């Protein structure tokens, strides 16, 4: 897991639950995950094990609540501490590597790498013009392309209906 993934989880938890009265309790996404887990368990037990009589109903409810509380504690403490450890280690790795990269040779600071120029990228992405009388671009794989002879471009109407212009 990386820092961006954990930060994304935290941001998602904050964005979904932004109601003022519940903001403090639902700010942690792990609490939200635990509540969702509890709801899923309640629905699962209600569907798979419907109580028949009062004794069984009470016993099932007690077992259900014990399971939910145990899972809540398990999820919250285990996952939260593990992810906090991972988050702290990732932060330290990032800090140490950035300091190491900046100061490799003592006080010497390595300049940042400049991005490639935009004009070169645009020229490569731009479609190439096909001159009149040249072969189609799709047929270039059959044999090597001959040097293109520059001919003046012919108007489209003349290509379609040459008889009108020849008269």
Swiss-Prot record:
<feature type="transmembrane region" description="Helical">
    <location>
        <begin position="28"/>
        <end position="48"/>
    </location>
</feature>
<feature type="transmembrane region" description="Helical">
    <location>
        <begin position="60"/>
        <end position="80"/>
    </location>
</feature>
<protein>
    <recommendedName>
        <fullName>Transmembrane protein B169L</fullName>
    </recommendedName>
</protein>
<keyword id="KW-0325">Glycoprotein</keyword>
<dbReference type="GO" id="GO:0044423">
    <property type="term" value="C:virion component"/>
</dbReference>
<dbReference type="GO" id="GO:0016020">
    <property type="term" value="C:membrane"/>
</dbReference>
<comment type="similarity">
    <text>Belongs to the asfivirus B169L family.</text>
</comment>
<keyword id="KW-1133">Transmembrane helix</keyword>
<keyword id="KW-0946">Virion</keyword>
<keyword id="KW-0472">Membrane</keyword>
<dbReference type="GO" id="GO:0033644">
    <property type="term" value="C:host cell membrane"/>
</dbReference>
<keyword id="KW-0812">Transmembrane</keyword>
<feature type="glycosylation site" description="N-linked (GlcNAc...) asparagine; by host">
    <location>
        <position position="88"/>
    </location>
</feature>
<keyword id="KW-1043">Host membrane</keyword>
């Amino acid at each position: 897991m990386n820092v961006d993934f954990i930060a994304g989880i935290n941001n998602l938890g904050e964005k979904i639950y932004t109601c003022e009265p519940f903001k403090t309790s639902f700010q942690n996404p792990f609490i939200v995950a635990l509540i969702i887990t509890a709801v899923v368990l309640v629905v699962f037990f209600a569907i798979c094990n419907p109580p028949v009589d009062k004794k069984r109903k009470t016993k099932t409810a007690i077992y259900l609540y014990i399971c939910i509380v145990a899972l809540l504690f398990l999820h919250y403490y285990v996952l939260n501490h593990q992810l906090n450890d991972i988050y702290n280690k990732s932060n330290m790795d990032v800090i140490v590597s950035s300091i190491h990269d900046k100061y490799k040779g003592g006080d010497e600071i390595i300049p940042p790498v400049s991005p490639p120029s935009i004009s070169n990228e645009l020229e490569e992405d731009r479609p190439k013009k096909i001159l009149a009388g040249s072969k189609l671009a799709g047929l270039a794989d059959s044999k090597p392309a001959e040097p293109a002879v520059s001919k003046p471009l012919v108007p489209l109407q003349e290509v379609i209906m040459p008889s009108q212009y020849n008269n």
